[in-house]
Curated annotation (Swiss-Prot):
CDD domains associated with the record: Plastocyanin (cd04219)
Cofactor(s) listed in the protein's UniProt record: Cu(2+)
Sections of the chain in a coiled coil: none
Organism: Ulva prolifera (Green seaweed)
Membrane topology recorded in Swiss-Prot or TrEMBL: Peripheral membrane protein
One function term, GO molecular function aspect: electron transporter, transferring electrons from cytochrome b6/f complex of photosystem II activity
Gene3D superfamilies given in the database record: Cupredoxins - blue copper proteins
Annotated compartments: Plastid, Chloroplast thylakoid membrane
Gene expressing this chain: PETE
Plastocyanin-like domain mapped to chain residues: 1-98
Name of this chain's protein: Plastocyanin
Cited InterPro entries: BlueCu_1, BlueCu_1_BS, Copper_blue_Plastocyanin, Cupredoxin, Plastocyanin
Annotated function: Participates in electron transfer between P700 and the cytochrome b6-f complex in photosystem I.
Pfam families: Copper-bind
């Protein structure tokens, strides 16, 4: 499984790493690393055709350190992801599914 931290160890508002490649159906575990409220929103304009961005997003906030969300993406392509409250600060990432 791939692991993505929400918030850097240094307190930065970032997905760490901010670019990953996974196999179709591989688990991606998002972990709140900072204790700030973060969420995982798939950009409806930046997912493969036919993918329901709302269905794979986790819009409810992960409020506490250590909270996790797991997603499995089965459609190959590139996915743009952002944290809604912190996207203005550049908290975005790209997931490539092969």
């Amino acid at each position: 499984a791939a692991i993505v931290k929400l918030g850097g160890d240094d307190g930065s508002l970032a997905f760490v790493p901010n670019n990953i490649t996974v196999g179709a159906g591989e688990s991606i575990e998002f972990i709140n690393n900072a204790g700030f409220p973060h969420n995982i929103v798939f950009d409806e304009d930046a997912v493969p055709a036919g993918v329901d961005a709302d269905a794979i997003s986790a819009e409810d906030y992960l409020n506490s350190k250590g909270q996790t969300v797991v997603r499995k993406l089965t459609t190959p392509g590139t996915y743009g992801v952002y944290c809604d409250p912190h996207s203005g600060a550049g908290m975005k990432m790209t997931i490539t599914v092969q």
